[in-house]
Amino acid sequence: MAKKIAVHRGDGHTMFILTSGLRSVRDKAITYFEERLRRNEHDLTRSYQAVNALAEEMRRVYNEDNEWLLKAGLHFDLHCIVGSQMTEDDAPHLFLLYPQGNWVEVSKGTPYLIIGETRFGKPILDRALRYEASLEESLRLGVLSFNSTEASSADVGPPMDAVVYRADSYDASEHRFGAEELEPIAQFWQGAIEHAVEQSAAPFAALARSIGLDPAP
């Protein structure tokens, strides 16, 4: 299965790009952007400049392909999450890039970004993920979010690709988690949810009585 994360390491900078949407559109835009990096790498010294460069290549692909996509009943739906620290950045940055080429940056008010199938994995992130969370806690929540999506969507499943970037390291560690690695987490999470439902009987007792139901023992 093709990775949906592209990691770029250069002289004094690191960037990773996560994507969702049509594979053909994604591959073309990333190819154009990688070629631009090879030609003009030293001109992109700030993260926002790199994101703007990727946005320009996305618009280029849109102008080339959108007419033909529409004729085939398809839509230009490429979304990207871009994390980077460039040579003149004083800290890492994380952006959500929309198909139109506009973007937003992560902040304390929005401690995570999510693309693709978002309906099922988003609730646990909204409830539990905080801007101050450690990388290890963020990984746990990310895996649980992935499992929640997998349980409710036939289009999502292992493997799961993960990237960790530490500030000022200018390097990123990557790992692809297979089904065997994720299965113990899936079993734990299923059991934890079932246990929480069982333990909810007492708080729900008054609600049950109010509509004529006998509370669980």
Task: Name each region found by the language model.
Residues 1-217:
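N-terminal nucleophile
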